[in-house]
């Protein structure tokens, strides 16, 4: 066997369907589109969501709520993530450098999820009531 004699396995490749190339091909004349009607014409079909003139679903349903753009400035970390960190004093700048919070984050809060067994001092970082109790129980504190 030579490299120039390698061919795909039989049946693994299919020829591209060429429509409108004579009646002998089986896909000539109307090219598989049937006779007349909107879908047989050039220029495509109706828009996505169009319901034939009936009021479309996305306009029948009321608007509801919104997505706050302030969310990108808030971040949260867990007690489990604090446990993994190899530092004793944690502040916002450190969390950004490590990549635990995004660059846009301005407010960070610790939530009670996971275990914390070592003392950690948080500077300028908030905590939920449960997380605060767990941090203080481990010998840590929250500094303003």
UniProtKB/Swiss-Prot annotation:
**A Pfam family hit:** Ribosomal_L27A
Q: Name one GO molecular function term.
A: structural constituent of ribosome
Q: Which UniProt keywords apply?
A: Ribonucleoprotein, Ribosomal protein, RNA-binding, rRNA-binding
Q: Name one GO cellular component term.
A: cytosolic large ribosomal subunit
Family indicated by similarity? Belongs to the universal ribosomal protein uL15 family.
Q: Which organism is it from?
A: Leptothrix cholodnii (strain ATCC 51168 / LMG 8142 / SP-6)
Q: Where is this region: Disordered?
A: 1-51
Please indicate which superkingdom the organism of origin belongs to: Bacteria
Q: Which SUPFAM superfamilies match?
A: Ribosomal proteins L15p and L18e
- Please give the coiled-coil regions recorded for this protein: none
Concerning PANTHER family, the annotation shows:
50S RIBOSOMAL PROTEIN L15, LARGE RIBOSOMAL SUBUNIT PROTEIN UL15M
The entry's protein name is Large ribosomal subunit protein uL15
GO biological process terms on file:
translation
Task: Indicate the quaternary assembly.
Answer: Part of the 50S ribosomal subunit.
Q: Where is the composition biased (Gly residues)?
A: 21-31
The protein's role, per its UniProt record = Binds to the 23S rRNA.
């Amino acid at each position: 066997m030579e490299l120039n004699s390698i061919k795909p396995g039989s049946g693994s490749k299919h020829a591209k369907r060429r429509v409108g190339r004579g009646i002998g091909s089986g896909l000539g004349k109307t090219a598989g589109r049937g006779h007349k009607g909107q879908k047989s014409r050039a220029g495509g079909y109706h828009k996505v969501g169009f319901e034939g003139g009936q009021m479309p679903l996305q306009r029948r349903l009321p608007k509801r709520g919104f997505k706050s753009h302030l969310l990108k400035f808030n971040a949260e970390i867990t007690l489990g993530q604090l446990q993994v960190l190899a530092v004793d004093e944690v502040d916002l700048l450190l969390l950004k450098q490590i990549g635990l919070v995004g660059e846009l984050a301005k407010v960070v809060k610790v939530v009670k999820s996971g275990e914390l067994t070592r003392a950690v001092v948080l500077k300028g970082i908030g905590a939920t009531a449960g997380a605060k109790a767990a941090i203080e129980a481990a010998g840590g504190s929250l500094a303003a």
